[in-house]
């Protein structure tokens, strides 16, 4: 089975970025996804270029911070920050034109870094929200980049990065028997979503997921990869 161990939130803060790099260099993280509106993007890009074995994708955002583009009124509050939260499914959908404009701007900003765009996913899985399905399919095909699996994309296997995503490595699910849980999965490819990081002041101000990130670093650096993993 091909297993991709992806670290989300790259570039969110310096501490998160450092934790991801440690979980890659000293552990089993194989890829990460960069938030183009994060607080530590420039540093994250430098670290990625110093660690070329780390595959880097983009973590598309509509639910944290500020947009890259101007004039995307349906996406923002009066203070200029995104109006959507992790509870976006309870909210009215935005203008699809605004979503496409903003996500395209984020992808173009990524391409300016000189990094190779490996794959696409999103903060809080918002690309898996059914009103946005057509937008993510269009961008994946246009930029010729695979997307994190979601049930809304099950009829489009040609654009999915893997056949399945494992989201249970989170909160109380962070433990070192990860691969014992995975070995019975009957798929050829699977992505494990992770969130390693070190807690810094910026993270405390911008995320509710804190010290478990440091536990993730420790676990990801201690897990032994079984032979059946490609």
UniProtKB/Swiss-Prot annotation:
Signal peptide: none
Alphabetized UniProt keyword annotations: Carbohydrate metabolism, Hydrolase, Magnesium, Metal-binding
UniProt-listed Enzyme Commission number(s): 3.5.1.-
Similarity remark: Belongs to the YdjC deacetylase family.
Subunit (UniProt): Homodimer.
Task of the protein: Probably catalyzes the deacetylation of acetylated carbohydrates an important step in the degradation of oligosaccharides.
NCBIfam families: PRK02134.1
Listed name of the protein: Carbohydrate deacetylase
Native species: Oceanobacillus iheyensis (strain DSM 14371 / CIP 107618 / JCM 11309 / KCTC 3954 / HTE831)
Organism phylogeny: Bacteria, Bacillati, Bacillota, Bacilli, Bacillales
């Amino acid at each position: 089975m091909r297993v991709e161990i992806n670290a989300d939130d790259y570039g969110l803060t310096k501490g998160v970025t450092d934790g991801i790099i440690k979980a890659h260099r000293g552990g089993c993280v194989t890829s990460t996804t960069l938030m183009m509106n994060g607080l530590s993007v420039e540093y994250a890009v430098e670290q990625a270029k110093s660690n070329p074995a780390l595959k880097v994708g983009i973590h598309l955002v509509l639910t944290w911070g500020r947009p890259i583009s101007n004039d995307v009124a349906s996406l923002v509050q009066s203070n200029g920050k995104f109006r959507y939260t992790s509870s976006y499914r309870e909210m009215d959908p935005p203008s699809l034109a605004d979503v496409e404009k903003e996500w395209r701007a984020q992808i173009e900003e990524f391409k300016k870094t000189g990094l190779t765009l490996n794959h696409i996913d999103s903060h809080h899985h918002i690309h898996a929200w059914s009103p946005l399905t057509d937008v993510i399919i269009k961008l994946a095909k246009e930029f010729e980049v695979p997307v994190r699996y979601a049930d809304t994309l099950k009829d489009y296997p040609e654009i999915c990065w893997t056949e399945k995503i494992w989201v249970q490595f989170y909160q109380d699910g962070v433990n070192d028997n990860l691969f014992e849980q995975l070995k019975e999965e009957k798929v050829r490819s699977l992505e494990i979503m992770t969130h390693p990081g070190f807690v810094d002041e910026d993270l405390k101000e911008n995320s509710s997921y804190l010290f478990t990130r440091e536990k993730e670093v420790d676990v990801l650096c201690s897990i032994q990869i079984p032979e059946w993993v490609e």
